[in-house]
Curated annotation (Swiss-Prot):
Keyword S-adenosyl-L-methionine: no
Keyword terms, alphabetized: ATP-binding, Coiled coil, Cytoplasm, Cytoskeleton, DNA-binding, Microtubule, Motor protein, Nucleotide-binding, Nucleus, Ubl conjugation
Coiled coil regions, renumbered to chain: 452-498
Biased composition (Low complexity): 401-411
Cellular component annotations (GO), alphabetically ordered: cytoplasm; kinesin complex; microtubule; nucleus
Region Disordered: start-end pairs: 365-416
Subcellular location: Nucleus; Cytoplasm, Cytoskeleton
CDD domains: KISc_KID_like (cd01376)
GO biological process per UniProt: microtubule-based movement; mitotic spindle organization; spindle elongation
Name of the protein: Kinesin-like protein KIF22-B
Post-translational modification: Ubiquitinated, leading to its subsequent proteasomal degradation.
UniProt organism field: Xenopus laevis
Amino acid sequence: MVLTGPPQRESVSMVKRVSMLDQHKKSSCARVRVAVRLRPYMEEKEEDKVPTACVRGLDSHSLEIVNWRNQLETMQYQFDAFYGDSASQREIYMGSVCHILPHLLIGQNASVFAYGPTGAGKTHTMLGNPDQPGVIPRAVRELLQMTRMAASAPENENWTYTITMSYVEIYQEKVMDLLEPKNKDLPIREDKDHNILIPGVTLKTINSFGDFDEHFIPASQNRTVASTKLNDRSSRSHAVLLIKVQKSQQVAPFRQLIGKLYLIDLAGSEDNRRTGNQGIRLKESGAINSSLFTLSKVVDALNQGLPRIPYRDSKLTRLLQDSLGGSAHSVMITNIAPEQTYYFDTLTALNFAAKSKQIINKPFSRETTQTVAQPAMKRPREEAEATTSSRQRKKSKTDSTESSPNSSMESTGKRKLNLASLDSAVVERLLKLDKILTEKGKKEAQLLSTPKRERMALLKKWEESQMEIERLKEKQKELEQKAMEAEARLEKSNNSDLSDSSVSENTFRAPLRGRNTSTAKVKKVLRVLPMQGNSQLQSTIEEGIPVFEKKKKKQVTCDGHENQPTWEMNMRTDLLESGKERILKLLNTGSVKELKSLQRIGDKKAKLIIGWREVNGLFKNVEELECLEGISAKQVSSFIKANILSSISS
């Protein structure tokens, strides 16, 4: 079905200007207002010039478009405003834009951006021409008039108004300055108050509309445009004009109100099959479509109430963060085309506009107060350096005072107390007390000058160190007690077998007297403890002390000669067997966690043991660990010794 009927003329009513007080009394929530503008039908170059429009307006708020699934049906859309193909630039400005400008004078933000497919008339809506100026020149002109009228009002006698402008474009995900082109990608930042700003961007002060024209017209020519099959002057970037209004109080308390107006001309989405883009144009089109897709994701996330809004996924949405779901009074002008060839582009734009009008912003006034008498705030690093230097001066002064105590004390005595009349012992105690108080005062002053967070961290660290010291003291007492008990038992055993030791020593020394000392070879004897008899060994076993025997071992060299004897430690047989039984029981019944409690058994070996046990059954002895892959006999031997020694020491 083709809509060929003439579009209805919409009735345009003048918008009532609301005072700043009434604006301030309004609710803090403001929905994004969406207006749709239909571009006039452009005649085709074919012989058949009968208009074949796919969309038409119903009234000043609604329109209908053919349903592509069933051309006998139409789909209707309702918006805050609809402007037909005969609507003028002034009607659009007065109907949708001018009512948000008074918010700037009370420190609130506002934004106007044009959205739509390529060739739908977005740039014409925002810029216009000398005969029909668009939204940008009309808004700037009226804003200048409003500030002049507000400055001349009696209630604003002590207030001044300053208007500055900056103009940037987002070209292939790079923020470029248009007022002073530098071929440099400018960063986008967010301050502590969640305000979006562009450090390093050029700011120009404008006092009249002539100043604005002087800066804006050359900057607009710096914007990247190119010719495609659908548009002779297609914008290849998103243009963002920022107008900042600063209201400053000249008397105490020196308040400042800052309002920002964003005027944004978005680049249109493109179908490269129709535009015929190649090379650099194809790359530009990809960047444009990607940023517009991110914009649609932001709108969907806001409507669904998702916890994360993907503002940072593109430079465009990062700049529009305040306009969509932020703190600005926002107006979106959706431009559409009536031709059948633009049907799907128009349908997509209308669906996006319908989703955008559900977004709720929360505007608020940005007010700051400046105190003239207040000194300039130091940077944290400078403040730290100043604090350090002052502490060093205090320390040097204290050191010089301590180096000459007599002179300082004499002057103090003359000023406060006559020390000559006091006893020397009393004077000495007073001097010591004064020194202690001075040191304590210095420590408290340093603690008070420390920031709260750092001070709390220091106190917490001090408490932890005190607890650690107490724990170490308790452990030291336990170790000392065990050492004393072991020493007592050892002394008792030595005293009881002193006679047996002397007899044994004489017995071993007697044969040596009859030998020729000139031919005897000196041998090394290792004595860990005095030699004990069987009774001493039995008493030691009863007391539970493990006993190790020293075994003499000779090493044989390659030529058959014996080296000097070395010593090897052998463990008591009963302890060795009981330890092996305990290990064997754990190997046959233990879980992975229990096996890992053994010395030199990790997660991998514990799983190997359980796997071998499931396949081959229980271990018959500990030495069967050699059957496991990667475990040698030497490792099994060291494993047994380590676990038995560990059980004895524990």
